[in-house]
Amino acid sequence: MAKWRLATATLRRQLQSSSPTISTFKNPTKALSAAAHQSTRSYSTTQTDDSRGKWLTLPPFSPTIDGTAVGKDLLSDGDSVKSSTDNSKTTALRWILRCRPDLPRTLVQKLFRLRQVRREMSMSVDGDELQRSQLKRVAAKESLNVGDRIYLPLSVDNDTPQTPPAKKESFQCSDEERKFVCSLVLYKDPAIIVLNKPHGLAVQGGSGIKTSIDELAASCLKFDKSESPRLVHRLDRDCSGLLVLARTQTAATVLHSIFREKTTGASAYGVKKNVKSLKRKYMALVIGCPPRQRGQISAPLRKVVVDDGKSERITVNDNGELVSTQHAITEYRVIESSPHGYTWLELRPLTGRKHQLRVHCAEVLGTPIVGDYKYGWQAHKAREPFVSSENNPTKQSSSPFGLDLDGGDVSSKQPHLHLHSKQIDLPNISQLLEKMQVSSDSDISDLDSLKFDAPLPSHMQLSFNLLKSRVETCDKN
């Protein structure tokens, strides 16, 4: 009896603070009963359920795209892609946690136990228009249909801890640096950004790296997105040219799968001539001339540790050991040879291994890339200085982030790396994701292919002009 009185007193105090009508009752027991009935009624009547203003509305449920599966389908021979995610397994609880990751799971589960979560189902009318149903209670494990909305009490924001999560400080750019980074953008759509990366700018941070594309993208290249662009493939620090960034997590998953499946497919099943697949072309200036005008290099690579474990390098695996060996395939074509011992090559990597093009050129073709001192040091020591007949003074301009964007051509004492990611063809990911939002089984027979071409960096363009002029001079003589 004492416990009941204590509970009654506690409930009376709570209701007095929340309900102004409690003081109008002379009989406390009747007051408690009326207030309790009023509280229960607010969650049970249709009229209150249809008052959308008192609820926190989550986005309508949409199919989850399995980016990995989509990437595999794109590189297959079929004309459709499927989202392999089984939407019937997406429960109300899972959708709430996905839309509101800031809400503690225990709080969301408590809302379900208190029957304070509502569902508004979407129903098709004549196959075209969508009609909304009344709000109804939903259980945590109930599966959602496409278009369903979940409603939560507005009080959840008050019950959520207000301590903001620790955020990683973004790289701070000056106006001049921001303008420079934005000038690298060649293409932008809702799914991807394509950059023309300059020589000397690292793609990802690490030991001894002050500035990277990864940091700069988060600071300067968000544009209208709340998410930072994500890396989906790599270029060496000294390699220039086309670099693709994903603007959303879904686009990143699809692109990761495309780059990965391209390598896996070429290694295991040979080259697939699929018009929707990824295609990449590089341009390189090498020392010497390959024995043939064109060909395909298929040489496995492995990593070796040198300098007492202080560094590592990639080398062709000649001894047939399969341990830590990665198959690598490169197609090459001679563009033009110079009488001074240099050759312009077009390189097509069919797999994406670390330092693949540099090692294949140096160790398989015997023609290291100009400026590649890691894999072509001996060739550079024996290289005869290229003396230009033209007066090409080196500009001493100030470049952002300490980049050396002047000089470095073939006439320099230490030329920059002459390897440039010049062309990329890839499926239109933005168009694909739009199709997938409409249907999880999408026809991609008419999917567009995006083609990008990056102009040569200044040091390679100058080398091209110098060698071209020397060839013309020799022809005249």
Curated annotation (Swiss-Prot):
It is found in: Mitochondrion. Residues 90-175 form the S4 RNA-binding domain. Residues 1-43 form a transit peptide. It is an enzyme of class 5 (isomerase). It catalyses: a uridine in RNA = a pseudouridine in RNA. Its main location: mitochondrion. Residues 34-55 are annotated as: Disordered. The active site is at 236. CDD domains: PseudoU_synth_RluA_like. GO terms for biological process: pseudouridine synthesis. It comes from the Eukaryota. One of its GO terms (molecular function) is RNA binding. Residues 36-48 have a biased composition (Polar residues). Its EC number is 5.4.99.-. Keywords: Isomerase, Mitochondrion, RNA-binding, Transit peptide. GO terms for cellular component: mitochondrion. InterPro entries: PsdUridine_synth_cat_dom_sf, PsdUridine_synth_RsuA/RluA, RluA_PseudoU_synthase. PANTHER family: 21S RRNA PSEUDOURIDINE(2819) SYNTHASE (PTHR21600:SF81), MITOCHONDRIAL RNA PSEUDOURIDINE SYNTHASE (PTHR21600). Belongs to the pseudouridine synthase RluA family. This is RNA pseudouridine synthase 4, mitochondrial. It comes from Arabidopsis thaliana.
